[in-house]
């Protein structure tokens, strides 16, 4: 055993043994039945159980002290006959919440006890719910190779002088309770003391011993213990209970940690928090297989607690004799824990029906009955998480072919406690989302670079948009980016500098003068000389900037609006209007646009041009226009209004005026 002194080595060895578990449908662990009796794991299980027994025994002793202080008793009798022994009692106190040891065979007729669930009860109910102290584990192990009985004690203890249950100790209370109990299924409608016998032989079946589970001070109300079966392993989360025809027997709460390996060596389950034990008959290894009845699930109710639990029925492959069909049956069911408040409210109802109201959910008509000729090997199923609106699954096994009794009416419905589901951690953004976010930020930065800049157009070199006056460069009638309009030889920017356009390329002055391109340079359209400096192109021709001037005022028109006549003479706008603008027929002056405008406003009448201010009546000076009373009535090439025109006609118009028409 020295190799297990190291706690790390011990834990590592035990974790290696967990590879015998296989995945279940509900995500928990299922025991590999093929490896349950492997002898190479016996030493590991024994050492691990011994270690855990010491830890749990300390916790149970503390719980026992607290219960004894809260429940002072007038008289005490020896606990369970006072026949308790060292390590065996420690292991029994831990129950099946720890990996069980390979237990020795117990001779027929002798009863041994194992531990079951210890629920926490309120102080006022502790008097009627004593918890058994540590008992020795032991049963008939079908698959064990150990022979003689290692430890045994009488199944029945003598009753103490005090018959009041309030003054009995844990063991004596259940012993007296078992002696006063009738046989299961005989008279289910009698007093609540019909709960099954514990620690005593099955009535009418001598030679068979009944195994029971006693709770040993486990303070957690929902942390159950495991019972053990011959050569079988339990799946975590299922319990077993016993009941008569229509009498209801409470079932315990069963669960086990997923990291524990269970090797079950007992042939039947026993008492859990006062639940009567299931007797053992002849050893008939009937493997349990699930049979889908009523579409794989049957609904069972508790007549006292109003609890509904859907479950599936397990039936053995081996049929029993017909005379056993009316006998006791053995069931396995999953019972969900009720809250302490619900248990208090329903305590009176549960006691009237012969139930322990603190055991949670009890099923009516499905509580197991013992079969005197069959040994049922229950399989624990993994417990599913309970929600506010779901009932826990219920699994049951039938050791005979007897029909399941009908449901009993429920006086009330009990709402189960809701288990809050914690949401998993939120996943971070995916790779695609990160790329999309980066692209969006890039586009936003590019848009922010030109928030409200003016758009000039597309660059002829890179075909991209030109935003803002700082990037725009116009040359040879085309639009460039400032960075795109560069010398073809040295790549220097040519904005604001002299450049030369040769054979479709632009060069700076230095590269043009020292490269021999002057032989093919453009000539000025006006002077005819080579353009060695800056070039100015207008109207499809090349000019020196100094040669491009107005023919009237000789002003340089580089960068200034200009116009040409039909002979391609260049004028500034002012001189163009002076020379080529139409003349007013009244005053003889050219009609020029007003100051600050390039548009000319004139009046055309009788195929003549007039200033707006010159178009009026020559006699009275009335401004003429298209309005009524202001219309023009010309006479002998003179402008008159209608009244002046009539006066002129009355004086005797000349023959030429007869042909005048009104305009």
Curated annotation (Swiss-Prot):
Compositional bias of kind Polar residues: 138-153, 230-239, 267-296, 335-351, 364-376
Isomerase as UniProt keyword: no
InterPro entries cross-referenced by the UniProt entry: Ajuba-like, Ajuba-like_LIM1, Ajuba-like_LIM2, Ajuba-like_LIM3, Znf_LIM
GO cellular component labels: adherens junction; cytoplasm; focal adhesion; nucleoplasm; nucleus; P-body; plasma membrane; RISC complex
Highest taxon of the lineage: Eukaryota
Coiled coil location: none
Keywords: Cell junction, Cytoplasm, LIM domain, Metal-binding, Nucleus, Phosphoprotein, Repeat, Repressor, RNA-mediated gene silencing, Transcription, Transcription regulation, Tumor suppressor, Zinc
Region of interest (Necessary for nuclear localization), residue spans: 459-663
Region (Disordered): 74-99, 117-158, 230-253, 267-297, 335-416
PROSITE patterns: LIM_DOMAIN_1 (PS00478), LIM_DOMAIN_2 (PS50023)
Annotated localization: Cytoplasm; Nucleus; Cytoplasm, P-body; Cell junction, Adherens junction
Family of the protein in this entry: Belongs to the zyxin/ajuba family.
Name recorded for this polypeptide: LIM domain-containing protein 1
Originating organism: Rattus norvegicus
Gene: Limd1
């Amino acid at each position: 055993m020295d190799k297990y002194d190291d706690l790390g080595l011990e834990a590592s060895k035990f974790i290696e043994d967990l590879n015998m578990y296989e995945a279940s449908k509900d995500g928990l662990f299922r025991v590999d039945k093929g490896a349950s009796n492997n002898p190479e794991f016996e030493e590991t299980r024994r050492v691990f159980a011994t270690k855990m027994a010491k830890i749990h025994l300390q916790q149970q002793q503390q719980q026992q002290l607290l219960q004894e202080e809260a429940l002072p008793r007038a008289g005490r009798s020896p606990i369970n006959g006072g026949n308790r022994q060292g390590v065996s009692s420690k292991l029994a106190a831990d129950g099946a919440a720890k990996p069980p040891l390979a237990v020795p065979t117990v001779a027929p007729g002798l009863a041994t006890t194992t531990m079951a669930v210890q629920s926490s009860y309120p102080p006022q109910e502790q008097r009627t719910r004593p918890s058994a102290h540590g008992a020795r584990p032991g049963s008939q192990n079908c698959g064990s190779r150990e022979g003689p009985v290692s430890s045994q004690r009488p199944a029945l203890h003598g009753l103490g002088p005090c018959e009041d249950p309030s003054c009995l100790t844990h063991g004596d209370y259940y012993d007296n309770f078992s002696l006063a109990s009738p046989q299961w299924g005989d008279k289910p409608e009698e007093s609540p003391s019909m709960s099954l016998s514990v620690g005593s032989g099955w009535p009418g079946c001598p030679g068979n011993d009944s195994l029971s589970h006693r709770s040993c001070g486990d303070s957690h109300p929902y942390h159950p213990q495991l019972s053990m079966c011959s050569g079988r392993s339990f799946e975590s989360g299922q319990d077993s209970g016993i009941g008569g025809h229509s009498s209801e027997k409470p079932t315990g709460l069963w669960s086990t940690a997923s990291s524990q390996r269970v090797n079950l060596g007992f042939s039947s389950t026993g008492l859990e928090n006062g639940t009567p034990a299931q007797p053992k008959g002849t050893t008939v290894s009937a493997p349990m297989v699930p049979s889908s009845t009523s579409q794989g699930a049957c609904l069972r109710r508790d007549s006292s607690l109003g609890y509904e639990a859907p479950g599936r029925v397990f039936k053995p492959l081996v049929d029993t004799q017909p005379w056993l069909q009316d006998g006791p049956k053995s069931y396995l069911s999953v019972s969900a824990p009720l809250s302490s408040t619900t248990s208090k409210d329903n305590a009176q109802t549960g006691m009237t029906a012969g139930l322990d109201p603190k055991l949670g959910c009890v099923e009516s008509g499905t509580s197991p009955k013992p079969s005197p000729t069959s040994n049922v090997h229950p399989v624990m199923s993994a417990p599913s998480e309970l929600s506010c609106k779901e009932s826990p699954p219920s699994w049951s096994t039938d050791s005979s072919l007897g029909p399941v009794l009908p449901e009993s009416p429920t006086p009330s419905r009990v709402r189960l406690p809701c288990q809050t589901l914690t949401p998993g951690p939120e996943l971070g953004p995916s790779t695609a989302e990160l790329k999309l976010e980066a692209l969006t930020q890039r586009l936003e930065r590019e848009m922010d670079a030109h928030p409200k800049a003016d758009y000039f157009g597309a660059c002829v070199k890179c075909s991209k948009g030109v935003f803002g006056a700082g990037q725009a460069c116009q040359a040879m009638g085309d639009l460039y980016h400032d960075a795109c309009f560069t010398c073809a030889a040295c790549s220097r920017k040519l904005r604001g500098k002299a450049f030369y356009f040769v054979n479709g390329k632009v060069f700076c002055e230095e590269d043009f003068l020292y490269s021999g391109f002057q032989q093919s340079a453009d000539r000025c359209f006006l002077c005819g000389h080579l353009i060695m400096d800056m070039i100015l192109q207008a109207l499809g021709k090349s000019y020196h900037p100094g040669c491009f001037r107005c023919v009237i005022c000789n002003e340089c028109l580089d960068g200034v609006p200009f116009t040409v006549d039909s002979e391609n003479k260049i004028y500034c706008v002012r001189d163009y209007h002076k020379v080529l603008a139409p003349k007013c027929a009244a005053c003889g002056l050219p009609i020029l646009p007003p100051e600050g405008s390039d548009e000319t406003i004139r009046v055309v009448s009788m195929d003549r041009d007039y200033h707006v201010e010159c178009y009026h009546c020559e006699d009275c000076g009335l401004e003429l226009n298209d309005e009524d009373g202001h219309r023009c009535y010309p006479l002998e090439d003179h402008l008159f209004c209608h009244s002046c025109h009539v006066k002129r006609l009355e004086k005797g118009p000349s023959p030429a005026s007869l042909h005048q028409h009104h305009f």
